[in-house]
Every structure is written in structure tokens, then in C-alpha cells.
Amino acid sequence: MNLFSPKEVSQLLKRYEIHPKKSLGQNFLVDGNIIQKIIAAAELKEQDIVLEIGPGLGTLTRDMSFYVNEIFAIELDQRMIDILQETVGSCDNVNIIHNDALKLDYQELISDFIEFSPAQLQCKSKQINPKNLKAVSNLPYYIASPLVLKLAKEKVPLSVMVLMVQREVADRFTASPGSKNYGAVTVLLDCFYEVEGVFNVPKTVFYPQPRVESQVVKLTKRSEAKINDDYQEDFIKFVNQAFNSRRKTLVNNILSIFTGEKSELSQILENNGFSAGIRGEQLTVDEFAQIFKIIYNRIKYS
């Protein structure tokens, strides 16, 4: 079956009486060149374990299976599971998993390949080096941001994520301070990953065609996160609160999560070279980390 042929894809969907759901972001990639560019960006190797979220018809899954050790293809829609059994069910290294990617316990999922040590928040290799654990997906648009943040927060030791996302989402991932797209997701991802846009994807390479353009982004895990593990949960809370209202100053946004007075917070900022009236979107990621560490060390967190 030629999954790069819109006509054959249409026939396949009709055979299973499936009408793609916009609510699930079901626009299927039908361009082999784009598939190969995604695989090249991920630098897939035969030792790699790949998480693929939203495999759809299995187009990317099938091509990746020739390059890697194992694939965990996680699909929410039971109708797609039936198709995947036909298109990639015969691939020995593809595990089709019917589950919600936003609720799945990823550490449990890959425990057969990696032994986790919660006390050290690290992982010890069983069968593979953690550097060989990657996520490669044409993500359903509606889950892109929450999924990537979930993987970061839960410390799933992914060395690389290569993801196709809506262009608007990619712009938020890679935004610069002061821009309209710069927000909490930008800051948090940059703390854990080096984020780059790889290439744009036109809507014409999908069936059915979406209304928006896409972009493939690459997130490479930093050798050391910008915030120590012990403080990451509080830092995430801090950053989210800093962008709670873009029209408010940083001090006014974060006041509710600290026990200190507003004047004390303002004074701390000014003593360290920052304006008391600065807003979250004006700060670089490194400045966010710097301010958090200063305030955290001087005022008890509520």
C-alpha cells in the first residue's frame, strides 16, 4: 500500500469508514521526502528507542522502523489502531499502544529498556544508552505544547525530540524575549532543551489538507538544565505565574506565590539590576533563572 498517495489513503480511510477528525488533528502526511527529512533531523540509529505520539496511518512509523531498535507508537483513536495493525502490525520492532499521550506514564512504558533511579532523578542503562531514547512525531496540533511540557516535567530522559507542529506552536517554542509569541512554554523548554526550527512544511503535503502551515522543530536535551532538579517544580510554578497576565509587572504576577511584601520583591529586583516594573516577556531565560534563584533564596516560598 502506498501511504504517500492521497488517493490510496482516501480509499484506506473509506474502507475503515473513517472520517478524519479535526478535533484530533488528523491530517495525514503523504510526502516521502518530508518523512526522510524528519528521519535525518532525528539522526536515527539502529540502537535508538523512539516514542511516536499520534502515528495516524503509520506512514512515519513504517519508515522509521527500518532505522531503529524499537518504536512505541502511541495512538488515542481506536479507529487508527485498527489501521495501524494493517500498515505496521507486521513490523517486529513496532509496539502499537492504545492510550492517551497526555496521561501515559512514560517511565513505566520504557522501563523494560531503561531502569530509573528516582532518588537521583537519573537513569541507568539496561539494554540501551539513554542517549538513544528519542521522540519523533507528527504531533496532533492540539497536544503539542502540553505534551512537550509533560515530558520535560516528568524527566523522561529523551536526548532529542524532533516534532512536526503547527507553525504557530513552533513560533512559541522558538520565540525571542519581547515578541508576542514569547511565553511560559518558551522559557520552560529553553531551560531543558536547545530548541531550533528545522524546516517549514507546506499544508499541501497532508491529506486532508489543514488550514495552517507546519514546522519541524528539534529539541536537544541540555547536558545540564538551567535550574537544579531540586527547584524545578517551584521554577515551573514561578514561570507560569510570571506570564499569568501579560499586562501586569513581574512583581504583581508573582506576588501571590511568595510570602514577601511587594516592596520587598521590588527592592530585590532593583538591587540586582532589574527594574521593579519589568514584565515577564522582557526577560531572557537566563534572567528568569537568575531572578528565581535570588528571590527563592531570600523569601520563603509559599
Swiss-Prot record:
Its EC number(s): 2.1.1.182
SMART domains per the UniProt record, alphabetical: rADc (SM00650)
Enzyme's top EC category: transferase
Catalysed reactions, as listed in the record: adenosine(1518)/adenosine(1519) in 16S rRNA + 4 S-adenosyl-L-methionine = N(6)-dimethyladenosine(1518)/N(6)-dimethyladenosine(1519) in 16S rRNA + 4 S-adenosyl-L-homocysteine + 4 H(+)
Binding site for S-adenosyl-L-methionine: 27, 29, 54, 75, 100, 138
Keyword Cytoplasm among record annotations: yes
GO CC, any one term: cytosol
GO MF annotation, one: 16S rRNA (adenine(1518)-N(6)/adenine(1519)-N(6))-dimethyltransferase activity
Xref: HAMAP family: 16SrRNA_methyltr_A
Function of the molecule: Specifically dimethylates two adjacent adenosines (A1518 and A1519) in the loop of a conserved hairpin near the 3'-end of 16S rRNA in the 30S particle. May play a critical role in biogenesis of 30S subunits.
Protein name: Ribosomal RNA small subunit methyltransferase A
Origin species: Natranaerobius thermophilus (strain ATCC BAA-1301 / DSM 18059 / JW/NM-WN-LF)
Organism classification: Bacteria, Bacillati, Bacillota, Clostridia, Natranaerobiales
